[in-house]
Structure formats: structure tokens, C-alpha cells
Amino acid sequence: MVKPEDGARVPVLKAERISKTFGEVQVLFSVELDVLPGEVHALVGENGAGKSTFIKILSGFEVPTSGRILLDGEPVSLPANSAAEALGIVMIHQEFNLAEHLTVTESLFLGREICRFGVLDRRAMRAETRRVLDMLGSRVDENALISSLAVADKQMVEIAKAISREARVIFMDEPTAVLSREETDVLFDQVRKLKAKGTSFVFVSHKLDEVMEISDRVTVLRDGQWIKTAPTSLLDGEAIAQLMVGRELSSLYPSKHEPNVDEEIVLSVRGLSTGYVRDVSFDLRKGEVLGFSGLIGSGRTELMEAIAGLRSRTTGDVEIRGRALPVHDFREATARGLAYMTKDRKGRGLLLDEGMTSNLTLQSIGQHVRHGYLDPSSEAKAMARAKRRFDIRVRDDRVRVGRMSGGNQQKLLLAKIMETEPQIIIIDEPTRGIDVGTKQQIYHFIAALAREGRSIIVVSSELPEVIGLCTRVAVMREGHLVGMLEGEEISEQMIMRYAAGLRRQTAV
Amino acid sequence: MEVSTNSEIEERVPRRRTWRDVDLRAVAPFAALVLLLIVGALVNPNFIGLTNLANVATRSAFIAIIAVGATFVISSGDLDLSVGSMVAFVASLMILFMNSGAIADPSLMLVAAMVLAVVIGSACGLANGLITTVGRIEPFIATLGTMGIYRGLTTWLSQGGAITLNSPELQSLYRPAYFGTVLGVPVPILVILLVTAIAAFVLYRTRYGRHVVAVGSSREVARYSGIAVDRVRTIAFVIQGLCVAVAVLLYVPRLGSTSATTGILWELQAITAVVVGGTALKGGAGRVWGTICGAFILELVGNIMLLSNFISEYLIGAIQGSIIIVAMLVQRSLTRKS
């Protein structure tokens, strides 16, 4: 045993000079990482920095081209695929590896069921599952079907699975991307408890505030290179962001331009109800950037989809420049210059198996029809224009969209929406899961669109984003619009007060 | 708007096309066709003769034309199992109409009967489409149902026997539609080429074609892009019905008769041709010329078995069944590589 003295602790897992090449492309250049027992180690970097590849190598899902991995100071070669779990190294994927039709207990023991005389010992497995869940302080029912669980509970089951396999190092790839703030808090509590018992975590995230909150040390990767490893306490969010992009981020947010109070009202919503969205009214002026804030599940996306005509509304009117918009008619809304950009770019925004051009022109294909047939050269011109305008960077123009980085996908989605020449643009979560550099670009695109006289609604769960971009912020809570903040009122504390139900404006 | 000025004059580096750029999935069916031709030539020297090959192509016409329609349905993410029954149903009604003697003039009667077949075929396709989209029933189940309905109606119309074109005058007038040639090329081959060319144009060069691929790749993305998903799917079924009608127009002059067993298992052959041709069964990429290639392959395999003496031709069904499984395996392994 090694004494737990400072500086003398032997890392559980250590990666030395790891390089990885795919075909002719080198994605990792001699990257180093060491994980100490009972440590939460954050791994950050822009999209495409090589984080995912790196943790796949460390958890045995990929084989490094060169370099070695040491477990407890001994060089090991990790067995292929999930067999590394036997060594106590567990990876929790972004998309969970849970079969929806199994119960929690069955999931936990999948592939290593306890048997007595060849028959499943259900009672023993249930008891063990309960023990692990209790240890985690989770109230998930061990007999519940996975499909009935909330996302946060599924995450908890994954963690329980890791623990029941006596994991020593748990890799988590953006664990909080799909969690609300409350769910994130629960997850972090569990992480701290396990950490106290000596389990180590490697935590990949784009959310720097969470990195600051939970991690002990941070390792920054940029373009496949190791940049820095430092105790989190010596850094702040700004410093990490700078290390990630390698340049000053002085102007993450562009300057705001408030429209004149007598500027034309382009969109007017009165008493709109749909699903559990109740009686929402607001106006949007020409050239305005209006934010919609609130907790996840507060009904913002439902409201916006009802405005755009993607879902039906039970009551209420939507007017564009004084003319009523029919219910549930997305194409009419598009024709009248309203565009909705979904937050689910992979599931609803882009055809992942297709190329960039057919994605770009999908919504505006009518513009490229000449005498009844499509004109490929017109489409190619639109693509070249969009690449310049939105700085879409790809090595090969014919790449499948599913292979592009999240940031480039998001730019392509924005370009696709803009092909319909909208005057009113609703952007749902403009920067979900993309790196700081691209975020900054998207913020500037939004500001530039507003300066051109277009009106923009930004729906976002990231408070700094809403505060940094918008001249007015609407706050929703449980389907109601509970506050409309302007000017000095726009602050994290104020928005949270409305979002959490501590304050409420009677007439909005 | 932020326009990066330095990329105004973008360098157009002409990338050299290497063998790696070739889409294996698009090429595979044609490679298989060439391979089969070589095998056939080795088995029997008569095989590679122009007469034999023209015969094979002519015989593949029914399946090829139906499979072109199936390419649309499958590309849009659906499936139509009713095509074989639909052939029997449409053909029966067409012959019954010609036997009715409603129009005295034979040429006029023939034209009217052909129009009727096209209308009935489209209507059958429309029924499939509406049951699937408006009724929100899985296409597999919906067309399994109509497959039974069309087949049952045919059996009822024919009272279990055969429906035969009575008028010898009409028969001789209609015969050239299958047996005739234009500039030495059999009419069915010309029809295949025409139907395929139109289909390829619609699928690759029109707005509707782009919508089919989008709907087949992801219904949700299509919906969020303002595409009328249900309309696109329904029209694909109508195109399928139209293609079945065209196949019937060639089928009736060939035998001048239908029965309850007409077109049995043609749905299997049509789907096989589509899959062999490289169209993904889960929707998305549609390959019309690949489909035609697939239909030729199916017919060639049968022909080779007939000409060779070492495999019984009674095994044709089993071989065709195996081909669809092999085609799926090949498709999947090629997807993984690319």
C-alpha cells in the first residue's frame, strides 16, 4: 500500500504519450493524463480536440497507435470493448447503454446474472440492486422498467451498474447534457459520495461552471495536444476557456443593440395555450433579440413549436405583422418569414446520412427548381455561399453530415434555416453541446442577423447566454410566462427567482 | 453578416478521384451482374448470345417495372407487400372490361382498357397509402391486409378459375405490346428503360424525389423542414400502383389470361430486386438503376439454372430467397466500411 501523502499517491490510471491515428489523420499527439484515487478529473477541450477518442482509448474501446496505459503503476493493455470493466474501468456513454424493456435489476446484472443451480436467483439480485441504489441515495424502484425512468434516473442506474461492478475509474462523457439543474445537483452529490470512498471520475463536459464546481483537477486538450493539467482551484472559467481556444475570449458576446421602442411589432402572441402551456402573450419587435429562459420542462419548446405551427394550439392568436397565422400550419409560417430552429439537430434538424448540400436546401428546395427540375449548380452556389457566410469548415465537401463536428452541424443547421430568408427566427438552444469557439461565432451571427433588421427569439437553458445576448428576457415556469425582464433587471439572480417561482409578475 | 473576406476567391483544388471515392454500394449490384454474365457464359455458351439475353431482359420486365415503384416506397421508409395481388386484381378487371364489349371499336376499347388499368392501379396504390398514413397503420400490416383483399377479390371475380380475353380481334391487336419489337428491340425492354429513366429523373432531379429521400432518412427531420410527410408517402404508394398498372399492360397481352395465382410471390421478387440494387431497406438512399440491375440479376440466376444441368430449376424460389439474405449481408458490411 502506498501512503496517501501528497505527491506520493500512485495514480489509479495513467496514460503516457498516447497517440492515435485514424487512416492518415492524427487525432492525438502524445497526450498525458493521470487519475488519482478519489479524484474528479475534468477533461475539457473544444469539439474535435480529441476528448472522446482519448477516453475511448482509456476505457478500452479504442487501441492507441502508440503510448502506454498504466493501472496502479503497472503497464496494461486494455482488453477490447467493455471487457475493461473487469479491471474496474467503466465508461458511461452519452447515449445510455440500457435496454428499455428490462427492469433496473435486470439491467444491473445483465451479462453476469446470479444463478443458483442454473436458475436465476432473482431475490439475491434484487437485494443487491437495492443495496447499491440505497448507497447512492437513489429512490429508483429496482423493479421499474428502464423505459419508465426519467433521464436522470437512467444516469443513476448507469452509475449503480458501474459501482456494482466495483468500478475504480468511471468515465463520464457529458453526463449533464441531458439533465436539469436539480438533476445535475443530485448526480454531483452522488459523485462526491463515491469520491469520498475512493472512486475516481474522469468527467468530460462543455459546461465550465460545472467543471469548476465538481472537479479537483482539469486537463485541457486542444487540437489533439495536451495543453495543461492544473488543480481547478488555481483556475477560473475564463482561464479554462482561454486555454481551450488558445486565444483571448474578450468578446464572447457581441454588443447589444436595443431596438427603438416604437419599432414595428413583427410577431404578436396573445393568450396562447397548448399542452400544458397556458395563456402566454408577448410581442417581438423588429431587430430585437428576445430571450426565453426557464427550467427544462417549463414549456418553452412547446410554446415555440405552437407559434411556428409545428404543433396545434388549443387557444390563442399568433399574428405576423398584424396578420393572423393559421393554427398548425408550419409551411404557411415559413412562407410568411418565420423560421424555427430545433434544439435537436441530430434527431430533427439534419439528415445525418446525407451530404451537406441536400441538408442545406431541404427546406428551401423550391428555390432551386428550374422548369420543374432541380438545378444542381444553383444548389452548389447556395452551399458555397453558406460555407462562407457561416464559416462551415470541412475537409471534404462530400462528407456525410453525421461525421461533422457538433459545431459545424449547428452552423449548417443555422444556414439551412436562413436559406428560407426568414424575418423572424426562433432559435431553440443555439449552442447545445458545441465548443466555446463556435459558441462565440454563433452569438455573433445572431447579433448580426438582428442588426440586419431580423427579429430573433433565443430559447436557452444557459443563463449567461440569455443575459449576454438578449435585450429582453421572458421567463417561463410550469407552462406560464411569469416574468419579462428588461435592461438592468436581466441578471442570473433575477431570472432564477422567476424560474423557481419565488417571484412572478401579475400582468406581463 | 460576418463574411470572411479572405475566402472570397476560394481555391478550387480539383481533387483527384481515387478508387476510394467510388461508392461501393452503388457499384456492387453492377459488379454482381457482370460476374453472373461471366458465370453464365462458362456454364453454357448459348447463354451469352444476344437472343438469350434479350429474352431474359424481356422476361424480367414485370418484376423490373414493379420494383421501380417499390424503390420509391422503400426509399420513403415504407413497404408494399400487396403488389403481386394487385397485378392479378388489375389484370382481371382489365380483361373483364375488354370482355364486356362496352365499346364496339377494338382500338378504342383497347385504349379505354389501358386507361382503366392505370386508374385502378393508381387507386389501389392510393388505398395502400391512405390506410398507412391516415389510418396510421404500419405499412407491413396495412399492405398485408390489402394483399389479402386484392387476392381475394381476384379469386372471387374469377370464381377460382381463370379469366381469359375472349375476343381474338383484341388479342391480335394487343399482342405486339409484349411480343413486338421497335428497331429490333423488344417492346418490354423499351418500356423498362422508359419507366426507369422517368423514375430516375423524378427521384434525383425533382423536389418530390428529394422529399422522398428526406422522409425515408428521417421523418422527424422532414417534418421540421416543412415537408408534408404523409403526402410524400402516399404519393410513393400511388407511384407503386402506377408501376404495377404498367406491368399489367405488358402482362395481359403475353398470356391473355389471369387466374387467382397470377403474380404470386412477385412482392418478394420486387423487394429483392430493390435491395439487391443497393436501396437501403430502412429508407433513405434510393437507387433506381440499381433496382433494374437487381431485377436482371434475379432473372439471370433463373436462366442460368435452367441452362445448366447441375441445379434443379425447381429450386429457383429458394435461390431467390437466399439472394435477398446475401444482399442484405453485403449491404451491411459495405455500410460499415464506408
Regions found by a protein language model. Give the residues of each.
Chain B
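Transmembrane alpha-helical segments in multi-pass inner-membrane proteins
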Residues: V244, R254-G321
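Alpha-helical transmembrane segments within multi-pass membrane transporters and channels
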Residues: I103-T146, C293-G294, L298
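Helix-loop-helix "hairpin" substructures at the membrane interface of multi-pass membrane proteins
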Residues: M109-A117, A123-N128, T181-T258
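Cytosolic-side transmembrane-helix boundaries in multi-pass membrane proteins
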Residues: M1-I38, L42, Y224-R231, V301-S338
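Single transmembrane alpha-helix segments in multi-pass membrane proteins
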Residues: I38-V43, L50-A102, P106, L130-I137, ...
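Inter-helical junctions in multi-pass inner-membrane proteins, predominant
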Residues: P45-N55, T154-G161, L203, G209, ...
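Hydrophobic core segments of alpha-helical transmembrane domains in multi-pass membrane transport
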Residues: A28-A41, A70, V118-G121, M147-G152, ...
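Transmembrane helix-bundle core of multi-pass membrane transporters
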Residues: P139-R205, V232-I235, R254-G263, L307, ...
